[in-house]
Each structure stands twice: as structure tokens, then as C-alpha cells.
Amino acid sequence: MTTTHILGYPRIGEKRELKFALEKYWRGEIDQAALKQVGSQIRQKNWALQKEAGLDFVTAGDFAWYDHVLTTTLLLGHVPKRHSHGFPDLDTLFRVGRGQSQNACGCGTGSAASDMTKWFNTNYHYIVPEFSSNDTFNVSWPQLFEEVNEALQAGHDVKPVLLGPISYLYLGKEVEEGFDRLTLLPRLLTAYQAILSKLAKQGVQWVQIDEPILALELEPRWQEAFKLAYQVIRGDVKLLLTTYFDSVLDTLDKIVELPVDGLHVDISAAPAQLETIVNRLPSDWVLSAGVINGRNVWRADLSAILARLQPVKTLLGERLWVASSCSLLHSPVDLDLEGDLSAETRSWFAFAKQKVTEVALLGRALEGDAAAILACDTYSQPIVARKSSHIVNKASVQTRINNITAALAERSAPYIERAHHQAEVLGLPFLPTTTIGSFPQTGEIRTERSAYRQGKLSEQEYVQALKGHIADAVKRQEALGLDVLVHGEAERNDMVEYFAENLAGFQTTQFGWVQSYGSRCVKPAIVVADIEREKPITVEWSTYAQSLTSKQMKGMLTGPVTILCWTFPREDISRQEIAQQLALALRDEVADLQDAGINIIQIDEPAIREGLPLKKRDHQTYLDWAVQAFKISAGSARPETQIHTHMCYSEFNEIIESVAALDADVITIETSRSNMELLKAFEEFNYPNEIGPGVYDIHSPNIPAQAWIEDLLRKAAEKIPAQRLWVNPDCGLKTRNWPEVEAALTNMVNAAKALRAEWQA
């Protein structure tokens, strides 16, 4: 028998039931019992789906109220002291993830949420564990055991999933100086022993223990920690050591020495590792082959996968398991919900529910089931047809791609010359003030957008409504005294989806939601074909806004790499080529904007760093083509057209050369929370172009004082020549309300004016 399973299933519910229940609970509209009932219903449905599809195990422990790393933190009794008030409960978990205001806690100070960061190179976020020297661990949070029991009582064969001890430590951070979190390992392992012992007593036979950091380039001390850890926690349950997102060949020497019972590897992300792993697999281990991609939306080529695995099946027999490459939480829930897709387009996709069916069908085919083998061949036919589809391949796009030259990615003059031209044309003051692009998406804007999409507003009525919001934004900015204005992006629901809806080559969905963190879900567009701009996208809005003011108006574009990173890409061509196609489309938009009289154009690239591959040796190749894509986008700009970009990172050191290579005339960055410390990277590199360090944190409702902003600007001027500084917030203002925005920007503009007077005296 070929054992079939998945590494996890989406926890949000097919129509985001968990999101809505969580938000009702946080607003006080339902109690904990009602919230838990929603969670139970989602789990029961997920398990039933896996069983009905024919999987040998259902996966328990993949459900999380906020984030699975945070769930592990509570399971281990490792709650930060500022959030620990007696025995942990759901509210404890939410305090760690979301923080608590002083009014809610009654303590007069509130408690800050733990940090949140990206889960490897996905668009999912996790709550970062915090470690200090006096930490203890105790198994006090019953969620995992309750859910295992729940699944057992429903008659399922259960395989719990547990984040492994080394990855848990690695993914956290020390909160005291001079302390190494790896020294906590012996204490942590005692807790893991207790967890595995308890699962064994519940009748569990296999535990999926996730150690995704084994796909990274680990320092020797972290590699050595695995052997100690697994010698200690080895007990009465079988352990499936689970890795994903990249190859584990770098750490395979250490892996095969571990006292575990099986290994899961991501064959989808790193297909070349399969043969080596099969040859080196210990004779008593199972191999779980992650061949169904858990991170995409594409139908699997089951016929090709079957052909690849049949020799492995011959070698390993029942020791071969078939699985998803990673948890399916990175995929939308159910393709069956999509009512607006054409039959041809639908045949290209598989969401989480369909991927479960793919795993089960592949397992039956590997057992020699003739009907299943035939079904695999039939299932793969749309993939073959898609390769020659006129919808997918466009000769006009391919011609442009083939004609890309180095000159296409260069401005027509170096920065020093451009800066001179721009100073003459733009006429901006010393320390120019601006914002990053978006203004509040008010309830009125959202209502109008919804009415338009439902056909309750005509296109003409909707356009007029949006123009009213743009005019209001321009009027407010002029009253505030900003130097460079923006139109406010009232027409955009999302900075990526907006461009996906207006570029040929994308497919958007109705219910293609995936979890980002907590209750936040995103609905990435899908790149289905060659990308082309068929008509101008932003020109009408920007030129209308420019017609309302004599001040400079910024055109606002989302950059090619960010659009790529925040969508589901094609897999029949390289990510580099998709980025090039996007860059060419945006290049045309830049040309049209400047021809229409827009002299400043911002090309946002907040995701360039997020797109870095997991292994450092692969970074430069990625950065080279990412930089090229940006420069192709900006390459149509004349010397007098000023190109801005915006990035929000917490770490620039490792990519500062590539940031400089973008050759943007102005870069705006997120720096206020770091007290301008992030500028050190630019100072040490001697960054040559202009910089707008964010002077206040837009994620906080707090209004920054003028003196505080002045102090930040003084610190910035110690690192960057004041003549090259801009004054702006950290990020867009979409999520704030107008009173907050106007109060903060008033102080920001006044701070700039005060320092102009002082420094130019």
C-alpha cells in the first residue's frame, strides 16, 4: 500500500468562516463557546474531506486560531511574561498575537504584541517566539490533544503535526543581550518528551514533526543540535521528520543519522533531490514524497509525477508515501466555489480541496490500479493543451521579451545629470514633503466600490464618485502644505490586485483567499498567460489629480517584482520572465504618465527582499533579475522625470548594493520604528541618490509630535546629507482615518518647515 496524506489543510474555512468568527469575538459580539464551535465545524469538515478523498491519515494540529507557531508557543507554556496572567486561554493567545491596549488590560500601560515576520519565503506570517535565559517550558495548553481526541472520536486515523524543537528555537529571537537561545534546548526537549508521550497514550502511531529549517544553509551548531534533540525526544510514537520549501541535500548527512522513522521532502520545490535521497534513505525509514505543490493553484501533472515515482515505488515498496509538498494553507480552499471561470481556465487549476484528491488518486495509481492510472492520464490532458493555448502565449509579448537588451534597463543619463534636470523642472524646496501614496479607504469608498461591482452604480457614476474622493484628497494635501501630492488611490482595492485586474494575463477569483496571519486573508491574483498592458491604467486618475493643482503630482505604480511575489505565478515559464513581462507593461505606463505631464512617478517595490530564495548562494541570481526588472520599468523615463521607489524592510544590509543598483532618483523607506538606525546601511554604503526616511509609523494611531519628527530628521541628517533628504511617513495611509492623517501630516510638514528655516539660516 502507498500511504497518502497531506501536511496540513487551510484553517480559515471555505468562505473565511474563521476570519469572521474571530473578528466578532474580538468585537465582543460572540463568546468563546461560539468561537470554538466555528473552529470545530471547520476541523470536522476538513477531516471528513480528507477521509472521503481516500487519504490514509487525516492531519490534526494544523488548525490554529491565529498562527501555528503561536499555537506551539502556548503548547509549550512559553508565553511572554507581559501577557501571562494565570492559566493560558484563548485570550492569552490573542494578547500575544495582537497586543492589548491599556484600557483593555486595566494596567495603565497595555502590552505589546510579539513581533510578526514572514514564514520563510511565503506570504504567510508567524508570531516570533521570544527567548530569555530564565525561560521555562511546560505543557499547559491542551489544544493539540483535544483536537487529536476530537478526530479520533470522529473515527479518523490521525497523524498529528507538531513544529519541531530546533525549528521552534531557530525561528524565535533572544530578548536579552548576550544570550544564546540554543542553550534552552535541554529544557525545551523535556516539554517535547511530554508532548510525544501524551500523544502516544492517546493511541497516535505517527507524528509529523516539522523541521523546515533543514532546507536552509544552517550553521554547524544548529545542525549538531538536531542529533541531541532527536536522541532525547525519541519515544513511543513514530516520527516523520518533515521538511519543505527547498532541497535538504546540504543537511542530508546529518538527517540520515537521526533516530526518526521517516523523512518528508519537498519534491515540488526541489525535484533534483529525489534520487539522492532515495539512494541514501536508511533501510527502515519511510520516504514521504511531497509531489503535489501546496503553494500554488495549478493542476498537477499526475501522469508525469506517476512516471517519476514508479521506479521509486519499485525500490521502496510500502516505504513510499505520497503527500502534498507543504501544508495546503498556502493554497485557496476550493475551486468548486469559483462560478465565473471558463471551462478551459478552470481545467488548469487545483485548490486545496482538489489537491487532496490529487494525492489520493496518485496513491491508488502507484498501487497499479488501472482505473486510477487512466484517470491520471485524463487529468493531465488540460496541462498539455494549455502549453499550446492561444490564451496563454502571445507573440507580441514574446517578441518584446526576445528584444530585451542591457540598454533597455538603463536611464538615458546618470543620476548626477538627472538630478540637475529634475531640480530645474520640479522646483522643489529643501527637505521636500510628500506621502507614500494611499489615503484612507473610507467606508464611503468601499460602499461605492461594492455597489459598482454589484451593478448598482454605473461606470460613469462610479468614476464621478472616485473623482470626488481624488479632489478631496488633493484639497486636503494643499491645505496641509505638502510639496509633492498624490491622488490617494481611491480607485484601488489592493495595490497588486488593481494592476492584475487591468493587465491582460491575470485571472482574479471570488473566493481564492489564503491566510496571511490571524484573521487577515489575502486573495492573490493568478498569472495565467503572457502579461500585456492593453491600455493605460493609471493615467486618467493621475492627470485628473494633476489638473486640480499647480503642485507636482506623483504617479503611483506597483513594481514588477512585488506584483510577481504577491500573486500566484505561472510555472511553465521562469519567475524572471514573468518579472520581465510585468516590467515591459509598467514601462509603457511610465512613458504614458510622463507624456501626460506627470513629472514624478513612484514604482513601489516592498517585496523585493521577500522574494529572496532560502539559500544565500541563490540570492545574487535573483537580485540581478529583480533589479533588471525594476530598471526596465523605469527605463522609459526621461532625465527630467523623477523616479521614486518605496520599500518597507527591517534589514537592508544584505541587499544594499542591489537597492543602489535600482538607480531610483528617490527611495522612501520605513525607518521610524528603528529610530533611524536603518539608515546606517545607506550611510556605510555611501548611498548616492536621494532618500526619504519614514518619520512616523503609520501602523500606529498615535500622532507623532513635531519635536519628535524634528529629532528623527536630525538623526537622519547625521547619516545622509540633508540636501538629499525627503520628509515622508513610513508607508501608505490607507488604513488610517482622516483626522489621524491630517494631525500627523500637519506635524510632519511643520517639522520640515522648522528645519528648513534653521538649516538654511
UniProtKB/Swiss-Prot annotation:
GO terms assigned for molecular function: 5-methyltetrahydropteroyltriglutamate-homocysteine S-methyltransferase activity; zinc ion binding
Residues that, per the record, bind L-homocysteine: 436-438, 489, 604
UniProt key word Transmembrane helix: no
Annotated binding of L-methionine, by residue: 436-438, 489, 604
Domain of life: Bacteria
Keywords: Amino-acid biosynthesis, Metal-binding, Methionine biosynthesis, Methyltransferase, Repeat, Transferase, Zinc
Record-listed E.C. numbers: 2.1.1.14
Residues noted as binding 5-methyltetrahydropteroyltri-L-glutamate in the record, renumbered to the chain: 16-19, 118, 520-521, 566, 610
Active-site residues, as the UniProt record annotates them: 699
Cofactor field: Zn(2+)
CDD domains noted in UniProt: CIMS_C_terminal_like, CIMS_N_terminal_like
GO BP annotations, alphabetical order: methionine biosynthetic process; methylation
Pathway linked to the protein: Amino-acid biosynthesis; L-methionine biosynthesis via de novo pathway; L-methionine from L-homocysteine (MetE route): step 1/1
Entry's cofactor comment: Binds 1 zinc ion per subunit.
Residues reported in the UniProt entry to bind Zn(2+): 646, 648, 670, 731
Keyword Metal-binding: yes
Database matches in HAMAP family: Meth_synth
General function of this protein: Catalyzes the transfer of a methyl group from 5-methyltetrahydrofolate to homocysteine resulting in methionine formation.
Family: Belongs to the vitamin-B12 independent methionine synthase family.
Protein name: 5-methyltetrahydropteroyltriglutamate--homocysteine methyltransferase
Species in which this protein is naturally found: Vibrio cholerae serotype O1 (strain ATCC 39315 / El Tor Inaba N16961)
Source lineage: Bacteria, Pseudomonadati, Pseudomonadota, Gammaproteobacteria, Vibrionales
Gene assigned in the entry: metE
